Amino acid sequence: MQQPRVESDIIGAGEGPQRAVPWSAWIIRQDWVRWWVCHIPRSWTQWWNTSGWRQPLQRMLWGLEGTLYLLLALMLCHALFTTGSYLLSSLWPVVAVMWSHLLPAILLLVLSALPALLFAASFLLLFSTLLSLVGLLTSMTQPGYAQDLDQ
């Protein structure tokens, strides 16, 4: 089956929908390069190709970036501080009531953990003493350890 032939004029009217072209295609088209060569002075392209301008520009952009990050950090600190102080002022009665109930529980927890902590500390002290005694005894058994004290 043969397709019907469609007549078109010079701008392509009558050819139907064109296929989709990616947006990046305009960079690699020859028309863009030709326009660049014709309209941009050679001194500009030489300046663009030299690397002398890039380093100061990069330093300036890094400084600007650092300043913006510092400003952002200050704004975040200010927002957190103001929000936090507002929340603390509104939640202070709740915190006071919770603290009055939690303080005895925390004290009881600490006091009940004291015997275990004392046992662990005494065990570690005993263990380190035994290790140092073993080290002393093993070093005394070396042949070069015994010295004549009369000399």
From Swiss-Prot:
InterPro entries assigned: TMEM239
GO cellular component terms given for this protein: membrane
Residue ranges of the TM segments: 61-81, 85-105, 116-138
Residue pairs linked by disulfide bridges in the UniProt entry: none
Alphabetically ordered keywords of this record: Membrane, Transmembrane, Transmembrane helix
Compartments it resides in: Membrane
Pfam families hit by this protein: TMEM239
Coiled-coil stretches noted in the UniProt entry, renumbered to this chain: none
Bilayer topology annotation: Multi-pass membrane protein
Protein name, UniProt field: Transmembrane protein 239
Organism classification: Eukaryota, Metazoa, Chordata, Craniata, Vertebrata
